[in-house]
């Protein structure tokens, strides 16, 4: 990656799973590895699909690709699930925000998790109400998550937050399919997320002025990056 802080973790996850049984089981292991892989690809400036943003690009493919690879679903089902996910993202974008700069990471990874949760419910034959409950639970689980990229790069903690978003989506989908409901209606959850995002201080909305970006580690990475830029300009 640009800073050298990101890269190789997806392969480490695959290697770990090949050597021993993971705590989370085969499917979730693939979800984790795929989320890392796609998010690392973004950090390394490779081609990705923003879903709904580049910073959250690993969540949706992380839950869908393993199912397709296993032959659990066909291409037509995946396409339908992607339409469901897109519809969810459009609603969240209209009622709240999908931008970390305006709503924090809850608006990016949180929305991606909601999209993925809804897509999974659709793949398993769930109806609109269950999709709504999955979306609500996925959003509630990440409510208030701040956007605090170290040195302003979409690397730390962004890559690993894609993993949390994907695993969150799986748990929300399974709960909804089990008949577990969100007590707060999904539209109200979305509106609440938008309100929370607007209340976040500017330091916690992609400015790299607060949160993990403001830690001694974060500041050291920023200083090294600025020093490197200065040296490049002198050349």
Q: What is each model feature region?
A:
Residues 1-49:
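Extended amphipathic alpha-helical scaffolds
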Residues 25-42, 77-96, 141-149:
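Acidic-glycine-rich active-site phosphate/pyrophosphate-binding loop
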Residues 45-48, 98-104, 153-156:
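Active-site-adjacent structural elements in folded domains
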Residues 45-63, 105-112:
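Conserved phosphate/anionic-ligand binding catalytic regions in large, soluble enzymes, centered on
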Residues 56-64, 112-118, 166-172:
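Well-ordered alpha-helical segments within folded domains of soluble proteins
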Residues 61-72, 117-125:
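Alpha-helical support elements that line or immediately flank enzyme active sites
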Residues 93, 98-106, 112-113, 117, ...:
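N-terminal glycine-/lysine-enriched basic segments
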Residues 118-235:
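Functionally critical mobile loop/hinge segments
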